[in-house]
Amino acid sequence: MLPVIAIVGRPNVGKSTLFNYLTKSRAALVADVPGVTRDRQYGETTIDSQRLLLVDTGGLVDTENKEVAPLAETQVEQAIDESDCILFLVDAKAGLVPADEIIAERLRKKGKKIFLAVNKADRARAAVVQSDFYKLGFGEPYVIAAASGRGVKDLMTQVLENLPEEKEVIEKEVGIKIAMIGRPNVGKSTLINRLLGEERVIVYDQPGTTRDSIYIPFARNDENYTLIDTAGIRRRAKIQDYVEKFSMIKSLQAMHAADVVIFLLDARQGVTEQDLRLLNRIVEAGVSLIIAVNKWDGLNIEERDNVRNAIDRRMPFVDFARRYFISALHGTGVGKLFRAIQESYQSIQQELTTGQLTRALEKAVAEHEPPLVKGRRIRLRYAHLGARHPLTIVVHGKQTKSLPQSYSRYLANYFRKTFNFIGVPVHIKLKTDPNPYEGQEER
């Protein structure tokens, strides 16, 4: 699971500035989807090859006229409780204020590793600033300037060195990892109960994990699977007994740990903004996607047509994902999900050589050439596999920076069709070949 770092502090100390500085490397990887409100409180970063999930707690609540509100709000409490460590941010210019001391006292009770960072500090006053905040009791404060990044590298290096070790390990034998993602009360617990409780399904405890584990290994028809429990669905004494609550952090962690995501929609409620935000996150994660529309049996023909039309209209950015209309309660259509999981997983495991991808690129260009730039055709030379999770195909050529987004989408769809990627978002990464004459003087 991705380690979770919560950024905590009173309003206007620079939490969002630090969050934006740390996550800016992600901004260019995935374009915003038209019509989808981006959820910017959660972001990823990679530091020294370690991926991290960051939570800007200031973005989780309206803090206007609430000096210590961020820590008191339920969402923020949940984010802190689910984090692996905390970046406690204070303001050097304002100095130590009572609100900082109140937050510090509350954080101490959490039993988490806490890093105190003093933001907006001048280099010349670093020693003075540190002494002011020593009394908070979190050891030597880290003096940073979030806007410029000064001191942030040293801070994050210490964070990495103090992350807790992974408590649970998924072994290869547990097979395909499945995450169930969806809003509260769309039927996730019912569907999980159906998946685990059907005939011929063997549920077993994995050695070294507790009954409360977020990993639930099971087998069906001699195939091994592991269900990654996302939204607080915890096993009690019996498999059939569940309690559900929504956690964005656990959902994001599960997306990145899974091989396949089943995204559950409630047919009676249609497509909501929260559905779109979650789907956008899944596309960013690059994981194989299956869409299951639940509670389908309770709709008449007209209502079903309306739901299908709403999905087509509001979810075109996931048109690569297969849809299944099911009833988790009665089991209708649930069996098809296992076949879909197998097909989606197998499609992403296929070998993809540079030769295969380059030949597909050549055919794509022959069928639909890139546009002209200043009278010259953009040339795409070859392609290779950049990453498998998320599936990233790197395309090399000349003037690729001028290639429109629409053509990148065309290439992604062409590769998906050519190699029969089932339910897999394809990311295109463009690289421009170096100009051999650049830097030479004209004669």
Curated annotation (Swiss-Prot):
Binding site for GTP 2: 182-189, 229-233, 294-297
Pfam families: KH_dom-like, MMR_HSR1
GO BP, sorted A to Z: ribosome biogenesis
KH-like domain location: 350-434
Keyword GTP-binding: yes
Alphabetical UniProt keywords: GTP-binding, Nucleotide-binding, Repeat, Ribosome biogenesis
SUPFAM superfamilies in UniProt: P-loop containing nucleoside triphosphate hydrolases
Molecular function as annotated in GO: GTP binding; ribosome binding
Chain residues that bind GTP 1: 9-16, 56-60, 119-122
The UniProt record lists the keyword Mitochondrion: no
InterPro entries: G_ENGA, GTP-bd, GTPase_Der, KH_dom-like, KH_dom-like_a/b, P-loop_NTPase, Small_GTP-bd
Family annotation (CDD domains): EngA1, EngA2
Domain EngA-type G residue range list: 3-167, 176-349
Family named by the database record: Belongs to the TRAFAC class TrmE-Era-EngA-EngB-Septin-like GTPase superfamily. EngA (Der) GTPase family.
Subunit organization: Associates with the 50S ribosomal subunit.
Function summary: GTPase that plays an essential role in the late steps of ribosome biogenesis.
Protein known as: GTPase Der
Gene source species: Coxiella burnetii (strain RSA 493 / Nine Mile phase I)
